[in-house]
Each structure stands twice: as structure tokens, then as C-alpha cells.
Amino acid sequence: MIQTKSRLDVADNTGAKSVLCIKVLGGSKRRYASVGDIIKVSIKEAAPRGRVKKGEVYSAVVVRTAKGIRRGDGSLVKFDGNAAVLLNAKLEPIGTRIFGPVTRELRTERFMKIVSLAPEVL
């Protein structure tokens, strides 16, 4: 469960290491984001020669949450931390690699690219 001011790790090779959620997209009163939701983020920590710079604002999709996601069969998939993948204006991933597992809930038409790049889909 991600909200404004939440810190997330970055699960791609754009050069960003840590981001801060500045807005949950999808309605004026929307408070929380879960796996598969799009958020606006500010880069808080970045590698020196990465594609992105500290302070820049991007869209991102949440790929892992510590809160977890409930499946239809009653099982719950949780992770150790929160992570996101940075997106460009067309909502395509900026990076060319994804690190760590992602959930099956990302398997929609919008995020098939992320699922195909991920080393493991839970």
C-alpha cells in the first residue's frame, strides 16, 4: 500500500535507486496505490551516470509491495519491500532490465513488457 511520501526502491536499470511517491494517479481523492497502479515519483537517489537525474519527476508502476496482494484463491503474495519501475510519457518502461520478481497482476496489456523482462513472475 503506497501513499504520498512513501519511499520505494527502483527495480530497473535506469540508474535511479530510490524514489518518493508524490501522487497516486486515478481520481482526485485516491489515497493508496497497490501492485499495478501508476504513481508519480521524484528521484531521490540516483547513480552518477544513469539515464535519470536526482530531482526529476516520472511516472512509475508499483511492482512489489510489503503489504502484499490478495489473490482470488485466498493466497497472499508479500515482498520484503516496496518497488517500482519508471515509465516514460507513453507509459512504457524506461529501463531495459527488471530486477527481482514481479507479480502476475501486472500481466495486463499495458505492462506485458515489464512481465517479459522480469526474471521471475509470482
From Swiss-Prot:
InterPro entries for this protein: Ribosomal_uL14, Ribosomal_uL14_bac-type, Ribosomal_uL14_CS, Ribosomal_uL14_sf
Listed CDD domains: Ribosomal_uL14
An annotated GO BP: translation
GO annotations of cellular component type: cytosolic large ribosomal subunit
SMART domains, alphabetized: Ribosomal_L14
Signal peptide region: none
Claim: Transferase is one of the keywords in the record: no
Keywords for this protein: Ribonucleoprotein, Ribosomal protein, RNA-binding, rRNA-binding
MF terms in GO: large ribosomal subunit rRNA binding; structural constituent of ribosome
Similarity remark: Belongs to the universal ribosomal protein uL14 family.
NCBIfam families found in the cross-reference section: rplN_bact
Subunit comment: Part of the 50S ribosomal subunit. Forms a cluster with proteins L3 and L19. In the 70S ribosome, L14 and L19 interact and together make contacts with the 16S rRNA in bridges B5 and B8.
Described purpose of this protein according to its UniProt entry: Binds to 23S rRNA. Forms part of two intersubunit bridges in the 70S ribosome.
Protein name: Large ribosomal subunit protein uL14
Gene expressing this chain: rplN
